[in-house]
C-alpha cells in the first residue's frame, strides 16, 4: 500500500520507493494525466491507521464463537490475549457474517487506539498455530468438534480454561541441525 503524506518531499517516491510515501499533490497530478481511455485500476482508499494490528483466530459455529484468541502484533513479537475492544469487534463480525469454521478477523487501531475492521477470512490464518502457546489449541478444538468427539460446552470450556497470556516471535528461517543434535 501507499501512504499519501503531505509532509514528504515530492521526490520521496523516487528517492525511497520502498517507503511507499507520496504527496497527495503528486498522486492527483498523476491521476489528472490519465486519459479517459485509460482509467487507473480500481483502488481502495482508506485512512492511514497508525496503531497496532490484531489478528483474531476463532472457532465459530453458525455465527456463534466457541473459542477465540487474539494476537496483538508489535514488530517481530505477537502478544496473545483474550479480551479488548478489537477482540470483541472480531467476535461480533464473525457473528454478523454467520461464520462457520476456523476463521480469522484482522483489525488495526487508529492513532487513538480505536480498532477498525480490515478483513474477515473464512479460513484459518497462518498464525493460528500460535494459539497453543497460550494454552488454547484452536485447531484441536475445531477438529474435536468436527469429529463429534466433544460437545459445544466442553469446547467452550477448552477455549477459556488454561488461558495464559503469552508472547511469541515468528521464526521463518530454517535451522539446520547436525546429526548429533537431531538424534538428541
Stretches with model-predicted labels:
Residues 1-43, 50, 62-64, 72:
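Active-site nucleotide/adenylate-binding loops and adjacent lid/helix of ATP-dependent enzymes
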Residues 49-52, 100-102:
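Short solvent-exposed loop/turn micro-motifs enriched in small/polar/acidic residues
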Residues 63-64, 112-113, 148:
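Detector for glycine-centered tight turns/loop "hinges" at secondary-structure junctions
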Residues 88-92, 136, 140-147:
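Amphipathic alpha-helical segments that line or abut small-molecule/effector binding pockets
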Residues 141-184:
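Peripheral (often C-terminal) accessory segments that flank ATP-dependent C-N-forming ligase machineries
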